[in-house]
UniProtKB/Swiss-Prot annotation:
Gene3D superfamilies listed in its UniProt record: Dicer dimerisation domain (3.30.160.380), P-loop containing nucleotide triphosphate hydrolases (3.40.50.300), Ribonuclease III domain (1.10.1520.10)
Stretch list, region Disordered: 1-47
Species: Coccidioides immitis (strain RS) (Valley fever fungus)
SMART domains listed in its UniProt record: DEXDc (SM00487), HELICc (SM00490), RIBOc (SM00535)
The protein's name in its UniProt record: Dicer-like protein 1
Binding-site residues, ATP: 119-126
InterPro entries xref list: Dicer_dimer_sf, Dicer_dimerisation_dom, DSRM_2, Helicase/UvrB_N, Helicase_ATP-bd, Helicase_C-like, P-loop_NTPase, PAZ_dom
Residue ranges of domain DRBM in the record: 1408-1476
Amino acid sequence: MEEPQRINDEPNDSVVPDPAGPSEPAESDSEDEHTHPNNADEPSIRRKQNLRFKELLSARAEEITAEDIKEVIKATKDDELSMSNLLAKQDFASVIHDPREYQVELFEKAKKDNIIAVLDTGSGKTLIAVLLLKHIIEQELIDRSAEKPHRVSFFLVDSVTLVFQQAAVLQNNINQRVDKFCGAMETDLWNGETWERHLAKNMVIVCTAEVLYQCLLHAFVKMENINLLIFDEAHNAKKDHPYARIVKDFYLKDGNAKRPKIFGMTASPVDAKMDVVKAARNLETLLNSQIATASNLSLLRQSVPRPNEEVWSYDRLDQPFETRLYKELRSRFGDLRALEKLFTFSLKASSNLGAWCADWVWSYALTEESLPKLEGRAARTAMGNLPIAKIVRPEAEIQRIREASEIIRSHKFGDPAVRPELLSPKVRRLHHELLKYFERHTDTKCIVFTEQRHTARILCDLFSRIGTKHLRPGVLIGVRSDASGGMNISFRQQVLAVVSFRKGEVNCLFATSVAEEGLDIPDCNLIVRFDLASTLTQYIQSRGRARHMNSTFAHLVERDNFVHRESVNHLQSSEEIMKRFCISLPKDRILNSDDVDALYESDRNRKSYTVQTTGAKLTYSSSLVVLAHFANSLQYEKETSTVVSYYHRFTKNAFVCEVVLPEKSPIRGIVGKPASKKLIAKQSAAFETCLLLRKHGLLDDHFVSTYHKRLPAMRNARLAISSKKSNQYDMKVKPKLWETSRGIIPTSLNIVVLGFRPRRLLHREYHPLVLLTREKLPHFPEFPLYLEDDIECDVICSSISSGFQVSSHDLEVLTTFTLRIFQDIFHKVYDRDVGMMTYWLAPLNLSCDISSSASRDLLDWGILQFVFDNPEIPWSSSNSAAFFANRFVYDRWDGRYRYFTHGIDPSLRPSDPPPSSMARRRHMGNIMDYCLSLFKNARKKFLENCDWTQPVIKAEIIQLRRNLLDKRTNKEKIKEGDYYICLEPLTISAIPASVAAFAFAFPAIISRIESYLIALEACQELDLPISPELALEALTKDSDNTDEHRAQQIHFQRGMGKNYERLEFLGDCFLKMATSISLFAMNPDNDEYDFHVKRMCLVCNQNLFKTAVRFKLYAFIRSQSFSRRGWYPGGLTLLQGKGQSKGATENKHALADKTIADVCEALIGACCLLASKNHRFDIAVKAVTALVSSDDHNVLNWEQYSRLYSIPKYQTAVVDAAELDLAAQVKKKLGYDFKYPKLLRSAFTHPSYPSAWARVPCYQRLEFLGDALLDMACVEHIYHKHPDKDPQWLTEHKMAMVSNKFLGSVAVRLGLHSHLNHFSTSLQSQITNYVEEIEAAELESGDPPDAWTLTSDPPKCLPDMVEAYIGAIFIDSGFSFEVVEEFFQKFLKKHFEDMTIYDTYANKHPTTYLHNRLAIDFGCSNYCLKAGEVPYVDGPGTRVLAAVIVHDEVVAEGVASSSRYAKLKASEAALSKLEGLPPFRFREIYGCNCQAGQSEAGNE
């Protein structure tokens, strides 16, 4: 007899689709995965929305013009503006008009040659630069049109402030793109691609010289990329200044054809006490330029009037002497090195300034604000270069500095206005002269130049006391953030000082050399050199500040002091020599090559190294910077700083330096070449180390580290992680438990009885099965399956306490039954291998009582033996009618066709056509033909030899639905009609129909059991005893956007049970509380801000994600629903049937980083619901420690929090009568009796209250703690009271419970407001008004629970008091959470018994209201609210654009400084636009057909 052929032997024969399953080869068991049963358009909708928003963002970035920004700038206060906008708001950036003749003359020269324009300060050198830039840009545009390489102009300055100032000037005078860069923008971290972008989009770049120099060194920019170099204050080009290095290292090394044009600007080419002519020639040589000045000086004089130059003589100064205060400080603290410079200045000031000024320096040098820097200096000094054995602990020195501060605080300074003898003759003369100018209201503006910063500060303070009411002094000194003695100043403060001077708010500026050059300070009519100019440049530049007609430039000169007189005369004569030299220079002169060679004389002993492929250059001086950047790149987040160490030693008349790199560097360092100077030795060592790093591939071809520094976790912008971007991670598909003893033939087995408890009567009988395993399984919770017509049935998994011994025969019987289940029911034939079986199945003995029977007796051995003995049930036509009823029948050749029989239908014969109730198949000739799944020859032979007289059996086809964990889809609800079959083409299974019916549910059951086991494995990794139910809930993610609670769920996975959302909501709150308690206990001296920053680092998603990845929690997350291929046991070889395809990715899943972090919070939430022996939060505390993985939270149970806490001194200090009275009053009101009344005092002390009076900290620390504790109490209440609400609802309604508005009303109702200690008149009136409003609201409304929602917002201090009080009782009670709960139950809970009254309050938020409007009122699901930072906008800060997009159309937009407020604005704008719009009109305008689509889906 010919062997029957399988259908898939004939691939060319087409298959007609039928409703029983998709069209496929007959071997198929119809188990193709439908991974995304949802709307297939959802991903494309999301992509379209993202694309639409990106287009909008790009468009808006261009539309937000300079005019928009100017409007914002105008409306913003000066002290709130950024540096660039602060300068833009002033007239620094005014448009320059009408060049004068001498400016045009110099411009024409600059067009032809490299020149250094020498003109007085204020004579318009910048205009010449603007004219030249416009000319160069015109040429550049022509060159670009001829497809020549792009080139850019660089305007170089010597200070950061000038970057902003000159950029503002150029932006207002040049109609091409101008950008500005300085080191503060972290330009040293930019790579070549970044610079390429800037060069491509800008015509002019204004930057500090160091920025360009570093670029040239790294070859990110080359001389051939530059068409013009402008050197502002060109006299700085000397020695190793970046101006000089740019020219020497790059400009002169390039060929003439590649060199850019050079234009220098200076008031004087001489910046030192040296021969004027020689200095000028050196500058010309160095800048490869010719000095040029106005040929007609009279024209220049007419444009820039010269001031009247005067000498103010003063009597001879006294010798430096020790004042009484100086003596006292010197005798007690003269050995403190941290105060050494102050002592030196004070002594000199006694002569130069007078006794009062000599003492006054201490008044600000030892203030509370200045002490930290002095203390830091003391600590560094103590730990400095001393050997370890001699290191002195700095605490004593710091304490002595504080003692000095106390002396100053109590010192009585004399009144210099009453006692002029306290001032030096020099200061008295200055005072005498200034009084003349400021004796009445005047427009006079004066700058007094001093040599030292302290002098400027002291004179400013002095003249604020002894000046007239019309003299308004101010101070302008150089930027130094590291200065001690109260003299640290930022760029911002410097610019604000200039702004005040420009506005006339200050009219007498005491300034150091910073006011001499560069900064655009308005014209003055009085300039005083309090300290004489030391160089010609100083002289000319400071004099140039006096530009008004009839202005005065005065030198303060000591009477009969030849040195002073000669100094002034020398400067005046030097200026004349310099001018004659400039005018007499021949026009056709060229630079002497010997002069150029002389430039490199100092560099002859310094090597350099150039990378030929890129042109990047390493020099002695640049090697220090390169090495510092390399070390910095080794730093990883919060690890210790990676600093290069340099160690010097002196041997054989030379210095030798050794470099030691940080520990993580693959190369530790090298010893440099001997050198005569310490600095050169250091540079040599750095240079040689860089070469070694380059040799080992640790520096690339641009001398940039091949490592990349991880930015600090502290940076808030980096704490958030993406909730959209997904990565592929390994996913556990089978629990580890199955593998532990696989491969070994067991001698005993454990039992789990599987059964159903239906909610309604089932139509079919289901015979329970027994799951047999090698290892004892844990107790599993009940979970639902949906059988037949979506009848919900609870699956009960009863784990039997004791196992039973099995023989080899028993195992053979059990293995046969289990494999027969896979073969007959699921069309899978496995290789028989008892040792590799994961588990076994057996029918339950229905006559046994589970609770009392022996384990072995629970198995129905009769059915097991029958199946073992009979591979199938034979039949014949002579069998009785009863034989044909209630059988399980299957098609051995086609896995789609399985039936339960009902009995014989005598009205039909095999040769009759199939009734119309049966789905169409390929062969519809007759019933016999319909039931046969063979092809051609085999089919023909079978039909020739079959019994055509056999009965026709009425049967029910079994649906191929496997995922019984969820209700049927619309497609699955299609009712199948009756089927009529012949048995000869089919096989009657030996498995009883009731057992088979239950077995069809087994894939869903075992899938959920395996999910429980995998979830428990994750908990075991963390050593957390979480129950299976909570563990699985915490690890279940059932859609791509699970966290977007009310958005349409993308790729929703059906039948997965509860997802992690609610547990995450609870865990997030507990995490906040736990870390707050730990930080509070461990850091008693930290302020609230420190707490917030540290907590932010602990609870941020980035930190949780990092820990989760370390534990590989991603593998345990359940992100995929029931798998038709994945539920089968592993270990066995599949011989027949479809297995998991080779290309399947079921062991991988895509997870967003935020999802992994959210799961951590969900696990913590799960632990909150577990009972513990001692404290109910013990396991949750342990979970937090495991998942934050930080020393800042390292406790294993609740009780350990209190052990961390070191009681601060103030808490146990002696309690005074007022504090006892306060505690008694509060006990009467609230019922809590404080052990430490100081804590209560602290809780009610406002930050404005002076600490010297309070003697306790203000409430901010306790408020930080109380806020987290109250959050937890509220969240627990709302979580348990509303088990069916999603996290969005919970969050919105929790906001009401912890809102400042509610807590403010609580403070008043409990009478706490009267106990607040504060020092603010305005606050008092605010509290009074608010209390009156609350009392009025109570009278009017009758005091309903939500009366507080109708009042205005309270002063912030009132809710802070409540939270601080909660923190205080928590600490006072020894870290008892119960007292917090008691407070909640007693005073807060009554307001929230009915949360529905707060629905309106929650929905008032514009974003929530917009969602409800679109989703509920309009029935739209294709909408989104997106936000993103607007790129390249130089506004007053970060600019974020938010947009509401409906069906690809932008409905509304909002721009703000943060995403939160931008979304708020966009939502409000969208609501305004949608107001009054009927649904039909909405659908017309936006083309919305969502409701129609939903209707169609519902009717499928």
